[in-house]
C-alpha cells in the first residue's frame, strides 16, 4: 500500500520526524495543534509575498515560549533589511499566540530537490500562464541535475484551459514508495488559474537512509554470535562434552 499512503506519514518515526515537536496531554492538545496550523498558515501567507521559498516550518514548544524553525531557500527575504521583517513577524506571532515566540531561519541548500518548493514554483508558473508541460519538464531536469535520484510530478485539472479536466504526469529515475528506508519527499500544492484550480503533486527520491546503520547493527549481531561461539569452545562447549562422554575401549 505504499502507493496509496502519504509518503511522509508512512515513514514517521523511522526516517522522518514530526514538524510539531512537543508533548502534552488532555484537551490542550487539540488547541495547540490548531494553533500550530494557524502559525503555519500565517507564516506561509506572509512570506509567500516575499518569494522566500519556505520548504517547511518546524514548531517546538516549552512551557514559556514557542520556537519556530523556518527552512527557506531565501533566508534574506525572511530576515529583511536590518532584521525588520523577522522582528515584525515575531511581534505579530506573539500577539496571535499570547506567548514569547523565537524564530530561527535555516537556509535550504538545494531548493531544486525540495518537493514543496518544486510544487510552488510550478504553481507560480501556471498562474502566470506558462505551459504546464514546460514547467514540469524544466523542474524535473533541475532536480535530477541537483542530485535527485528520482522525481515524479503530476498535474490535474483544466490543463491548458480546456473544458474537460484531465491529469498528466512526468517521471524520471525511480520512486520506491514501498521501501521505508527510501527518503521520499512529497508535497501537494494548488495553483489558482483563470480556468480553475490545478492540483500539483510532487515526489522526490533523495536516496536511502539508515543503510549504514542497518549494516552496523547486523555486523554487531554477527560479532556477538561469533564471540559466543568462541567462548563456548574455550570453556568446553558441545564438542568437549561429546569427547568426555566417549569411553576408552577395553583392551584387556
Swiss-Prot record:
Residue ranges, compositional bias (Basic and acidic residues): 222-240
GO molecular function: mRNA binding; rRNA binding; structural constituent of ribosome
Keywords: Ribonucleoprotein, Ribosomal protein, RNA-binding, rRNA-binding
GO cellular component, one term: cytosolic small ribosomal subunit
Compositional bias annotation for Basic residues: 241-252
GO BP term, example: translation
Region annotated Disordered, chain positions: 222-252
InterPro entries xref list: KH_dom, KH_dom-like_a/b, KH_dom_type_2, KH_sf_prok-type, Ribosomal_S3_C_sf, Ribosomal_uS3_bac-typ, Ribosomal_uS3_C, Ribosomal_uS3_CS
SMART domains linked to this entry: KH
Annotated ranges, domain KH type-2: 39-109
Coiled-coil zones: none
SUPFAM superfamilies: Prokaryotic type KH domain (KH-domain type II), Ribosomal protein S3 C-terminal domain
Pfam name, any one: Ribosomal_S3_C
SUBUNIT field: Part of the 30S ribosomal subunit. Forms a tight complex with proteins S10 and S14.
UniProt similarity note: Belongs to the universal ribosomal protein uS3 family.
Described purpose of this protein according to its UniProt entry: Binds the lower part of the 30S subunit head. Binds mRNA in the 70S ribosome, positioning it for translation.
The name this protein goes by in its record: Small ribosomal subunit protein uS3
Gene from which this protein is expressed: rpsC
Amino acid at each position: 500500500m505504499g502507493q496509496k499512503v502519504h509518503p511522509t506519514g508512512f515513514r514517521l518515526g523511522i526516517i522522518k520526524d514530526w514538524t510539531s515537536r512537543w508533548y502534552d496531554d488532555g484537551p490542550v492538545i487539540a488547541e495547540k495543534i490548531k494553533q500550530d496550523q494557524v502559525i503555519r498558515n500565517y507564516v506561509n501567507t506572509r512570506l509567500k509575498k516575499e518569494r522566500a521559498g519556505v520548504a517547511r516550518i518546524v514548531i517546538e514548544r516549552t512551557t514559556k515560549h514557542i520556537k519556530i524553525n523556518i527552512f527557506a531557500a531565501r533566508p534574506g527575504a525572511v530576515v529583511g533589511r536590518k532584521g525588520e521583517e523577522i522582528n515584525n513577524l515575531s511581534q505579530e506571532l506573539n500577539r496571535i499566540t499570547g506567548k514569547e515566540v523565537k524564530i530561527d531561519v535555516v537556509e535550504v541548500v538545494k531548493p531544486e530537490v525540495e518537493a514543496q518548493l518544486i510544487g510552488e514554483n510550478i504553481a507560480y508558473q501556471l498562474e502566470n500562464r506558462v505551459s504546464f508541460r514546460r514547467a514540469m519538464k524544466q523542474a524535473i531536469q533541475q532536480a535530477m541535475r541537483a542530485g535527485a535520484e528520482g522525481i515524479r510530478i503530476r498535474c490535474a485539472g483544466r490543463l491548458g484551459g480546456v473544458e474537460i479536466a484531465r491529469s498528466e504526469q512526468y517521471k524520471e529515475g525511480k520512486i520506491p514508495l514501498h521501501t521505508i528506508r527510501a527518503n521520499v519527499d512529497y508535497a501537494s500544492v494548488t495553483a489558482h488559474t483563470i480556468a480553475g484550480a490545478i492540483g500539483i503533486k510532487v515526489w522526490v527520491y533523495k536516496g536511502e537512509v539508515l543503510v549504514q546503520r542497518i549494516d552496523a547493527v547486523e555486523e554487531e549481531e554477527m560479532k556477538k554470535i561469533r564471540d559466543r561461539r568462541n567462548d563456548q569452545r574455550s570453556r568446553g562447549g558441545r564438542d568437549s562434552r561429546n569427547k568426555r562422554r566417549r569411553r576408552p575401549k577395553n583392551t584387556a
